[in-house]
């Protein structure tokens, strides 16, 4: 559970859950904020992106007349005030995203524009096909002022954005800015990211909970797992590249000298050629042993799926926890738990047990399908929206 007001100091670093109070910075970052439906007759100077619930699962977007809003496919929940509404679609960085993410779905957005103020609800409703039990997702709002760039990582991280002449979203294939500053292969960010610059509002989502980390100055540094970074900002792409250094947490292989003179050959070897060959052979096996040990520790002790990035300030970092969901609909977990599968007698054969498990699965599916999964939204006169489960009305 994310608290809407957290501002904790750790050493000289401000770590927060993206407090709803706007900070006096160039780019305001908000993850969670109590949001109420705005009065549609009220004049709005700019589009507003706000989070409705405490868990950051749904966002409210208030849109000016004649301003297009692009929402990711399957993430549109509802639209309020349908006067002269126009719906179309937009491909965002199609070719670059197709090459980089190997998916065209990350580029497909619904384009919405109306002649009056619109109130739109959006949520990360898309599903990933790689893992059957993916992590829960939370939303975050980026209010860009045009003075800093944001790098957002992940193919499904951008949920919605307002389409204006100032906001620009790019998906570079070749790291031009980073290649100018990188003197080694360790000074680089993950390649799969999109660049946000200009002025406007962008709705992003991350796995699990989303946290904000404020690095105060250049002496303020932090190590971040590459899998957990959602977004990072900076004055420019060159500034972002200069602030990141890749670090793999594994033990380097022990140094083995190039010379074989340190290896003493057995006394029975008199020939100098054989002594030299013996020394080179021993040296080869030492290097091989060191390499095998290094690869073992790197793969099985420290892991190869991710690496750490040392990031220095001043800048803002968005971190995602990637916590896994333990859904009530996990049928296999319920069936294998105590009491759902009865122990068979010694004389029971495997066929009867298989039929029994199949019947338990079918009954559990029917039970889950009959559970109420609808929610009732009540809009009061002051514009406040309350969500209640239908189970409370039965």
Curated annotation (Swiss-Prot):
InterPro entries: AIM24, AIM24_sf. It holds the Pfam family AIM24. GO terms for biological process: inner mitochondrial membrane organization. It comes from the Eukaryota. This is Altered inheritance of mitochondria protein 24, mitochondrial. Residues 1-111 form a transit peptide. Belongs to the AIM24 family. Disruption phenotype: Increases frequency of mitochondrial genome loss. Coiled coil: none annotated. It is found in: Mitochondrion. Keywords: Mitochondrion, Transit peptide. Transmembrane segments: none annotated. Its main location: mitochondrion. One of its GO terms (cellular component) is mitochondrial inner membrane. It comes from Saccharomyces cerevisiae (strain ATCC 204508 / S288c). The lineage of its organism: Eukaryota, Fungi, Dikarya, Ascomycota, Saccharomycotina. Present with 2290 molecules/cell in log phase SD medium.
């Amino acid at each position: 559970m994310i608290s809407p007001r957290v501002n904790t100091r750790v050493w000289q670093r401000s770590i927060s859950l993206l407090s709803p109070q706007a900070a006096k910075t160039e780019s305001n970052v908000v993850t969670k904020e109590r949001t109420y439906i705005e009065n549609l007759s009220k004049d709005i100077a700019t589009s507003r992106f706000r989070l409705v619930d405490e868990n950051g699962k749904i966002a409210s977007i208030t849109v000016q007349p004649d301003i297009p809003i692009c929402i990711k496919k399957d993430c549109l929940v509802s639209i309020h005030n349908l006067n002269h509404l126009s719906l179309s679609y937009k491909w965002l960085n199609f070719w670059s995203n197709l090459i980089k993410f190997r998916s065209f779905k990350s580029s497909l957005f619904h384009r919405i524009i109306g002649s009056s103020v619109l109130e739109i609800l959006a949520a990360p409703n898309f599903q990933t096909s790689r893992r059957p039990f993916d992590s829960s997702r939370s939303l975050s709002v980026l209010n860009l002022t045009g003075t800093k760039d944001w790098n957002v990582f992940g193919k499904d991280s951008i949920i919605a954005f307002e389409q204006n002449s100032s906001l620009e979203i790019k998906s570079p294939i070749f790291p031009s800015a980073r290649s100018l500053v990188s003197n080694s292969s360790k000074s680089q960010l993950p390649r799969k990211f999109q660049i946000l610059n200009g002025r406007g509002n962008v709705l992003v989502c991350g796995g699990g909970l989303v946290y904000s980390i404020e690095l105060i100055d250049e002496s303020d540094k932090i190590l971040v797992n590459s899998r957990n970074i959602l977004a990072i900002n900076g004055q420019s792409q060159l500034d972002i590249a200069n602030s990141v250094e890749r670090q793999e947490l594994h033990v380097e292989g022990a140094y083995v000298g190039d010379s074989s003179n340190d290896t003493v050959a057995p006394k029975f070897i008199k020939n100098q050629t054989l002594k030299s060959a013996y020394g080179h052979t021993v040296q080869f096996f030492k290097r091989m042993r060191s390499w095998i040990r290094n690869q073992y520790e790197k793969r099985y002790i420290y892991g190869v799926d991710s690496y750490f990035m040392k990031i220095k300030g001043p800048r803002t970092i968005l971190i995602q926890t990637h916590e896994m969901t333990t859904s009530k609909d996990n049928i296999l977990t319920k069936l294998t738990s105590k009491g759902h599968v009865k122990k068979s007698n010694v004389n029971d054969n495997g066929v009867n047990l298989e039929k029994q498990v199949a019947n338990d699965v079918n009954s559990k599916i029917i039970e889950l399908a009959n559970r109420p999964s609808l929610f009732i939204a009540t809009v009061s006169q002051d514009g406040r929206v309350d969500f209640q489960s239908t189970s409370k009305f039965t």
